[in-house]
């Protein structure tokens, strides 16, 4: 029987870089100008889902470091998960609106650390304003691909999702 915390599995999702020989040069694993150097750096990026109560790995996604996408790996892990209700716990790099919706629609929960609200690439930046201190708050927005004057005038109601941002839940 799987150990649960208040009815949930606790699954930590994180990634690690696995260096390989720089003699291996391909478009998926090799970076040039890594660490301010012109030397090639070849590696894989290992994304894992680890059960904190069972102390076992639940899933892995292996990506070439040059094309790694932690958010894509997180979505793959959530899509493949078929166990009891879970709380997915992850660090920065795994956050996105798409991931939040995906986890919620599968009746799971998430605890994902996000970039600072002042960061240009923070997923939360457009949901503010926020206090300049620690805070917990519920944020509710209607997601849309439209950019009407009504939508632009009410950022407290609507969140525009650009077409170049992955979002699996719009029809069309």
Give the residues covered by each predicted segment.
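Single, function-defining residue in the core of a domain
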Residues: 1-9, 13-27, 35-172
